[in-house]
Curated annotation (Swiss-Prot):
The gene is DIABLO. It comes from the Eukaryota. It holds the Pfam family Smac_DIABLO. Ubiquitinated by BIRC7/livin. Ubiquitinated by BIRC6. Belongs to the Smac/DIABLO protein family. GO terms for cellular component: cytosol; mitochondrion. GO terms for biological process: intrinsic apoptotic signaling pathway in response to oxidative stress; neuron apoptotic process. The mature N-terminus mediates interaction with XIAP/BIRC4. Residues 217-239 are annotated as: Disordered. The record marks 55-56 as: Cleavage. This is Diablo IAP-binding mitochondrial protein. It comes from Pongo abelii. Residues 1-22 form a transit peptide. The keyword Ubl conjugation applies.
Length: 239
């Protein structure tokens, strides 16, 4: 009986130790698995949260010091000035060319009237001659008005040219590349255009002067002939 109790006691002890050996790894694995399951969501949360944080933080753009420099701002401003002065110059050039053209037409109209009057000298009575002269006087007044108008516009145009030249020089001094070249080319172009219409008006004025000289010559000749006829008649009467 004592031997049986001793054997049972040893068996129970061995069984307990065996179960303890089996339970320790299981518990350890369970704890490790639980810790792993516990830490995994936190790791994901931290990772996702960190990513969201990075997305939420604004990334500052790299500044461009050259585009914000005083020199660049001056070049930009002077480019606007050259554009504005070029527009002003274009408008005044157009107005001046139109005014000179209208003046040239008025000169040719007066020239035509002078020539017609010259061709009719000696063929008109005093009333008809007065009527023709009234038309000539009106045409001359129209020509004078057109001339004054274009001279006034020419003063404005010269001011526009001066402004454009100063703007081009300012653009050159600030280091702008294209603005001064464009402005100077534009100035040269409008000067050529104005000079062309000036040549046409001077040609018309020359024609008018020739017509006036011819009219004066014809009138002087006619008056001389009339005087000679009068003297001849007087001489014949004396005889």
């Amino acid at each position: 009986m004592a031997v049986l109790k001793s054997w049972l006691s040893r068996s129970v002890t061995l069984l307990f130790r065996y179960r303890q050996c089996l339970c320790v790894p299981v518990v350890a694995n369970f704890k490790k698995r639980c810790f792993s399951e516990l830490i995994r969501p936190w790791h994901k949360t931290v990772t996702v949260g960190f990513g969201v944080t990075l997305c939420a933080v604004p990334i500052a753009q790299k500044s461009e010091p050259h585009s914000l420099s005083s020199e660049a701002l001056m070049r930009r401003a002077v480019s606007l000035v050259t554009d504005s002065t070029s527009t002003f110059l274009s408008q005044t050039t157009y107005a001046l060319i139109e005014a000179i053209t209208e003046y040239t037409k008025a000169v040719y109209t007066l020239t035509s009237l002078y020539r017609q009057y010259t061709s009719l000298l000696g063929k008109m009575n005093s009333q008809e001659e007065d009527e023709v002269w009234q038309v000539i006087i009106g045409a001359r007044a129209e020509m004078t008005s057109k001339h004054q108008e274009y001279l006034k516009l020419e003063t404005t145009w010269m001011t526009a040219v001066g402004l454009s030249e100063m703007a081009a020089e300012a653009a050159y001094q600030t280091g702008a590349d294209q603005a001064p070249i464009t402005a100077r080319n534009h100035i040269q172009l409008v000067k050529l255009q104005v000079e062309e219409v000036h040549q046409l008006s001077r040609k018309a004025e020359t024609k008018l002067a020739e017509a006036q000289i011819e009219e004066l010559r014809q009138k002087t000749q006619e008056e001389g002939e009339e005087r000679a006829e009068s003297e001849q008649e007087a001489y014949l009467r004396e005889d």
